[in-house]
Amino acid sequence: MRMKRRIRTDVCLILCGILVWFLADARQLRLEAVKALTLCAGTVIPALFPFMVITGLLVRLGFGQWLAPDMAGLMASLFRLPGCAGSALLLGLVGGYPIGARTAAELYASGDLTRQEAERLLTFCNNSNPVFLISVLGAGVFGSVRTGLWLWLIHVCAALLTGLLFRGLGRGRKTVPPAISFQAPSLPAAFVSSVRDSAGTMLSVCAFVTFFYVLISPLTALPGPWAALAVGCGELFSLTPLLPCDRTGFLLAAGCAGWGGLSVLCQTAALLDGTNLPLAPCLLGKLTHGLLSALLAAAASFWLF
């Protein structure tokens, strides 16, 4: 009890310090917020919103059930998951953060996954998309599509290895069968609900991107690669202008893309709110994904730099 009270006190003191900083530097923070909102309007929303609508529509129309027979053997043998879980993995790899987690939560809500299966899936299905890794990081930062392809390959391999490491998660707990049987809605109803829910999710994503963009802005003044490391741990979109175009930058890019940042973690927490799914499996999975990505990048860097 005393420990909890002490932690609560420390958190309140930190928040009070942040509030004082916000008040003392309001003009600069406003400028940073404008930059973040511009980033959301110009990059985040165009990159994510169409994917969110389509993936939501696919899940509602039974894409997981359609894919299940073809993915059943692979998902069961490697990850101890049903075939429909493959849709969350594939859509997460194509659509980017936080579409994998959103698809997993929808599969759980529709009754296609048990809670234990959904927790296991959350450890490795939430990933960055190839456009960000290949175009933004590879071509934009390192001036090489080949380097971007290596970043994407490392990201995918690390995600699959993370799934293998956590395939035993929840093994000792009783598995409760899903309580809801799948019933596909009509196409107009599925489309309307997908757009509506995606708009709400997009608003939440942009809110977290903006807040963390402002919060970590002082960290950009850190020397050398420390700025990229600190910023990448908080918000992924703010990382790109800070990465050095060398082996160190490559390791940081791979590791931070695997981790996703506190902003992505908060986006995932918002998606899981009300689903009865804990955030802990996703947190452990992203920490593992980031570490494995950095290790694989260290090995690949000898051929690239």
Where is each model-derived feature located?
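Transmembrane helix-loop junctions in multi-pass membrane proteins
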Residues: L23-V34, R60-G64, S135-L137, V145, ...
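Short amphipathic alpha-helical coupling elements at transmembrane boundaries
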Residues: K35-T43, P69-R80, A109, S193-G200, ...
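Transmembrane helical segments that form the transport core of multi-pass membrane transport proteins
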Residues: F63, F191, V195-G261
